Amino acid sequence: MPELPEVETVKRAIASIASGKKITDIFVGRKNLRWPIPTSLNKTLKGVICKQPQRRGKYILIPLSIKQILLIHLGMSGAFRIYKSRPNFQKHDHVAIGFESEEWLVFSDPRRFGCVDLFKEEYVLSHWLLKNLGPEPLSKEFTPDYIITKTASKTCSIKTFLLDQRNIAGIGNIYASEALFRAGISPKRQART
């Protein structure tokens, strides 16, 4: 599963094609991934301009000129491909966006654990997928005091604690394992110790 650094890289690639561009065409290959894809996607996005993409944990957020946000999570196997012109869509291409530049951004997810959502930007802090995310590892809120306070009463393993997105947003199995190895901490150790 892509983790925070990989999702940041994907976000930057999306920005290179989408930022400031008008959407002229939409392709929705299936009606659901992990959850249903909004049925309004096709109708709502045509003619809309994408603003600068953002990232929160493992989520990519694309603000739109209509004061809505397109939210994307890559899941286990999700990826984006960029084309210079309309491609022939493949079996696992679930959502594709065509721009006025004739370029296309195609979201493919063979395992279908990813998600695509569309919501009003005023709900960004209360969206059900975002509202309970903890601070990111490089944010100002992520301090030694934060970790001490959050782990004080946790009886779960430290690795389970690190993987819980409510505690720290963006960390996955690879970075949790690597951090614990480098720190010389057993992943099975209780978080509070």
Describe these PLM feature segments.
Residues 22-41, 54, 59, 65, ...:
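Basic, nucleic-acid-binding surfaces and adjacent catalytic neighborhoods in DNA/RNA-processing proteins
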Residues 1-114:
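A cross-family signal for N-terminal binding/gating loops and helix N-caps
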Residues 70-169, 175-176, 180-182:
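Phosphate/anion-contacting hairpin/loop surfaces
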